[in-house]
Regions:
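A catalytic-pocket lid/entrance helix-loop region that shapes and gates access to the active site
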Residues: 27-33, 37, 128-228
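N-terminal cap/lid subdomain of alpha/beta-hydrolase-fold enzymes
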Residues: 1-80
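Alpha/beta-hydrolase fold nucleophile elbow
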Residues: 103-116
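Alpha/beta-hydrolase fold catalytic core
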Residues: 207-283
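Residue in the alpha/beta-hydrolase core beta-strand immediately N-terminal to the catalytic nucleophile
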Residues: 63, 110, 137-139
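Active-site signature of alpha/beta-hydrolase-fold catalytic machinery across serine-
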Residues: 123-127
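Helix-loop module immediately N-terminal to the HCX5R catalytic loop
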Residues: 84-101
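Catalytic nucleophile loop
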Residues: 117-122
Length: 283
């Protein structure tokens, strides 16, 4: 057993249990879902998980204190665990104790975190390393390292730049592009999108108010070609569309909105005049 890799896995939130990773991808069984369509109501079904990694690694699913099956005991209080540093410390101490208790100090050791769990990964990795616990690898799932990229703060171009390839990939998946673009493979199309983002879109945003109308219209036309969203909309948005705006605008004419967590999903846009969708389609 000492030679088998061991993976400590947790979701994010903060405040989420590890249920989602456990029953979605990591465990021996997974919930049957109807991706990319809605999953029917109960009874819910289980099936063998063909993507489980238990054939080559042991997996420890961790519920942070106060989530899932983890509870405080003794005289502990919530503030002892519910903070960035407190969470890192509690997670790290659990891992250290687990490795010693079960004789796994010699095992190849990995962290796997999702969403806020990628924040946790970074802190836990440093905490463990400072105490002599070297890791063999860290796996980031749905990583977010800069919360600015989620909040789209004013006068910050970065969120729009890093989201743009996702906008384009979503449009390609839903066949919102012209024939030339749709006929390209996803890989070739996204390579073109990334090149455009780095060499044209980002420099255009960095010009700020110094960009000329001619330059701005040219970029707006490029954005329409790569996303299917009308160039007039891009122009009116000053070439910057927030994620929620894009997901609501992409298929507005069909009365549909795109999923935020998984943009393959489509939902009913109950009020198409809105800037943002009322619902967030998902399974």
């Amino acid at each position: 057993a000492n030679n088998r890799p061991i993976i400590f896995s947790f979701n994010g939130g903060p405040g989420s249990s590890s249920y989602w990773l456990h029953m979605g991808i990591m465990g021996p069984k997974r919930i049957v879902v109807n991706d990319p369509y809605y999953t029917p109501a109960a009874p819910y079904l289980l099936e063998d998980n063909p993507y489980s990694i238990l054939d080559w690694a042991d997996v420890v699913m961790m519920d942070p204190i106060g989530t899932g099956l983890s509870e405080m005991i003794g005289e502990s209080k919530g503030e002892d665990f519910w903070g960035v540093d407190q969470d890192i410390r509690a997670t790290s101490l659990f891992i250290m104790q687990f490795l010693k208790k079960y004789g796994r100090l010699q095992s190849p050791k990995y962290l796997l975190g999702e969403s806020y769990g990628t924040f946790r990964n970074a802190g836990v990795m440093n905490y463990l390393l400072d105490r002599g616990y070297a890791l063999n690898g860290v796996i980031m799932v749905s990583a977010v390292f800069d919360l600015r990229t989620l909040t789209f703060p004013p006068n910050d171009d970065l969120p729009y730049i890093v989201h743009f390839p996702t906008y384009a990939a979503t449009a390609h998946y839903h066949k919102r592009l012209n024939q030339e673009m749709q006929e390209k493979s996803v890989e070739d199309f996204l390579n073109e999108v990334r090149e455009f983002t780095e060499n044209k879109y980002m420099p255009a945003l960095f010009k700020g108010t110094s960009i000329t109308d001619e330059e701005k219209w040219e970029i707006a036309e490029n954005l329409e070609e790569l996303t299917g969203v009308n160039k007039d909309y891009w122009w009116s948005a000053n070439l910057k569309i927030k994620a929620g705006e894009f997901f609501n605008e992409l298929m507005r004419e069909e009365g549909k909105t795109v999923g935020r967590l998984d943009s393959r999903f489509l939902g009913i846009n109950e009020k198409t005049i809105n800037q943002f969708a009322i619902t967030d389609p998902q399974s």
